[in-house]
């Protein structure tokens, strides 16, 4: 048997090319999650990711036409570049921040050029990697809860804006050190970041929640005690049923019963002195006509935002007082970027996703992005955008065979090999 070595060489280069592309996108994904191992280069991780993606083209075979197949990316890339330049201008960014824009654009351009059949493979890679690093974090966190002594060091981030006890596999915010059961945040700066990132990965994993990696992610969400993550998780449960055109009524009886039992039990158990009641339910109580947990902005900022809406700064935004802690969400984004920034953001999202193959997947992705924007305001963060973008182009599984994990991988691999 004669083996054509030239074909083997092309296949190896193709595999290396796609592998480096995935590695660069994985690095971009974590660049906005700020895991502590990347703190030494915080603010430059996206630049490194963009450089890695450019480096991949050294290994690109001349006849490669199966991974970067899309040519309808120009409008979305131009809108993103415009949005980035605009945000830097209104934010009075320094020269270094402007110099990083081309590398950010490279990340989005590569993502938008990926063939739609390759997106499931990318998401499988990111999801499993997240589960692999979350698993030991959860294990050692549970040991910590039970009082096992673990090595640690003190740590701070963002010019000592955050202070942590770093147990290497997980961080404990110093504000939670006295809690009997602190909120789980894995390697990241906030429990909310960890919980929401896992929820958006689960959002893409429609119909596959019984897989080991999704069980790990679900456990991480529950341990985060993030109200935003919990609300998004419930929304994802219903969206998954809607995307698959399943009947709602019978499917929601069991989860509603479980949620109702947990809520009722939390008020009765130990006279309400328990984790579920103190960390979640008490934040859903209505105080002065508003939900207690709706604390994304302070009262001072709320008054300032009302004055802003009546000012001449409404179009291009105004500089915010950064000394005040605890403000985030859509109001902060509009305050800082103005309604011009909001328009550019919406236009970018629409341009990036409007060619989705399934209307329900597209609407679900837009809804998830909107809900996160209301709460956190930063929907161009890669841990939010990449799963949302891929989910918009996903096809809901219609048969058990289509729900198998390997199908998307096998299709992509076969197309690469040919």
What is the meaning of each model-derived region?
Residues 55-60, 87-143, 345-351:
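Transmembrane alpha-helical segments and their membrane-water interfaces
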Residues 262-302, 320:
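Flexible juxtamembrane loops connecting transmembrane helices in multi-pass membrane enzymes
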Residues 289-325, 339-343:
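TM-adjacent membrane-interface loops and short helices in multi-pass inner/ER membrane proteins
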